[in-house]
Amino acid sequence: VNTASECGYTPQYEGLEKLYEEQKDKLVIIAFPANNFGGQEPGSNAEIATFCQKNYSVTFPVMSKVSVKGNDITDLFKWLTTETNPDFTGDINWNFEKFLLDENGKLIHRFRSKVKPDSQILLDAIQKN
């Protein structure tokens, strides 16, 4: 999940943490903070980690800040946005896009920002795989 601390979707951290707690025996959630959209992740890595813990009690991994779009896109997100999947490819449109990979690292689903962590479409995709 590409994340940001000052975004309208930031409260999704709460749902992501709940999902992680409920599914952590078979699901790993990893947050990748990025400042690509509206400067909504201006903090340092330490500030981001503190924010996530203090405001949302996040226990899933929060990585160092990355770029998810543009000339300096991180290799992982370059792959995630170009890899063939049943949903769509292309640039990330905003913070909190979600990518579901299987246990072999195959990209199987991608969800736009508006899909909440507790949405049935996301939960069904997790259960199916």
Question: Model-found features: residue ranges?
Answer:
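Stable alpha-helical elements in mature extracytoplasmic
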Residues: 12-15, 44, 48, 72-73, ...
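Thiol-/selenol-based redox modules, centered on thioredoxin-like
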Residues: 75-78, 82-129
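Thiol-based oxidoreductase modules, predominantly thioredoxin-like and allied folds used
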Residues: 2, 26-44, 59-70
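Conserved helix-turn-beta segment immediately C-terminal to the redox Cys motif
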Residues: 5-35, 52-56
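Short, internal strand/loop/helix patches
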Residues: 46-95
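Loop/helix-junction capping segments adjacent to catalytic residues or to phosphate/diphosphate-binding pockets
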Residues: 7-10, 38-39, 70, 116-120
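Predominantly extracellular/lumenal beta-strand repeat domains
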Residues: 17, 30, 64-65, 69, ...
